[in-house]
Swiss-Prot record:
It catalyses: L-citrulline + L-aspartate + ATP = 2-(N(omega)-L-arginino)succinate + AMP + diphosphate + H(+). It comes from Hyphomonas neptunium (strain ATCC 15444). GO terms for cellular component: cytoplasm. Pathway: Amino-acid biosynthesis; L-arginine biosynthesis; L-arginine from L-ornithine and carbamoyl phosphate: step 2/3. It is found in: Cytoplasm. Homotetramer. The lineage of its organism: Bacteria, Pseudomonadati, Pseudomonadota, Alphaproteobacteria, Hyphomonadales. This is Argininosuccinate synthase. Its EC number is 6.3.4.5. Belongs to the argininosuccinate synthase family. Type 1 subfamily. InterPro entries: Arginosuc_syn_C, Arginosuc_syn_N, Arginosuc_synth, Arginosuc_synth_CS, Arginosuc_synth_type_1_subfam, AS_cat/multimer_dom_body, Rossmann-like_a/b/a_fold. Keywords: Amino-acid biosynthesis, Arginine biosynthesis, ATP-binding, Cytoplasm, Ligase, Nucleotide-binding.
Amino acid sequence: MSNAASAPKKVVLAYSGGLDTSIILKWLQVEFGCEVVTFTADLGQGEELEPARKKALAAGVKPENIFIEDVREEFVRDFVFPMFRANAVYEGVYLLGTSIARPLIAKRQIEIADMVGADAVCHGATGKGNDQVRFELGYYGLNPDIKVIAPWRDWAFKSRTDLLKFAEEHGIEIAKDKRGEAPFSVDANLLHSSSEGKVLENPAEPAPEFVHMRTVSPEDAPDQAEVITISFEKGDAVAINGEAMSPATLLTALNAYGKKHGIGRLDLLENRFVGMKSRGIYETPGGTILLVAHRGIEQATLDRGAAHLKDELMPKYAELIYNGFWWSPEREMLQAAIDHSQRWVTGDVTMKLYKGNAYLIGRSSPYSLYSEKIVTFEDDHGAYDQKDAAGFIKLNALRLRLLAGRDRKFGKN
């Protein structure tokens, strides 16, 4: 047992009910002799969560110290949708499905710690990945004095065999398929699924088809395209085909469309915040459709200057989320600017879904800046005087003409 003076008295553990966090729960009890409070979040990962309650009770956790919460609506409304207002993608392609879930889990752990008087929080992220950073930046960003326990960095176990031995010694149930090495590691929520490690660690080898759990193969998707209409209000999707939906219900529906048509697969070799490159197989079916649709309604409603500035800000915004700085002032500053840009982002977008692709085929908005009267190739009846373009071009060409004159006189250095 650790030094009694520094040992936590009560710990809020992010608990899935799986083997690893069940081992962590028992390790906390054995190592520190502390009281453990479990928090299990329903983020739309598609798993039955009540077994987590039974496992926690079997491990000696008091009933009043077991928190199982459905946070799907909060997750989509307060985290996913704000991120999609920014069109955020990391390194050009990754829709940040794992990254965006961590701030909410950290927030609820801190809130529960305050509620029950816990002096520490604990997560099950390994010492090699990004999640340890995301969780802990979240904890400290919300409670600067909280004690953080990261078992994968602290305990003495050297191998999976050591973990399984500890589990057996303490009566922790081990599923038969967990006795050997699992083929890959999975994280899932309502926005996406990610698979990493083991059979995926050679980036030259194609990922086995069985890794993909959220989407059919594009080759096996229907031969008939499907057309849907997504409605937006102030940057957030609010309806599909005219049917109003809550944020989580809408994303669930888009996931079903994306799954059916094989949309949202990504094989990415990404740069982790901790310094190494890692390979991830991501599936973000509904999010991929939503991103294309949101950019489509912005095409009609955002001014060029605002749209281009927003695109310049996006990589920084995405990097902040990827690295775990959701609760930072710079993310909040960027969010304020992004949200301000969405005041007029209202209207309908028509999408065609077909064999792995989400095509934007139409958009309309009462606040559209598109003027058919001005842009027409036919007679615009004086709406736009083409002669004005000559002066516009001359003024913009002035510095280029001066540079060209010098180059022609003295040659280019």
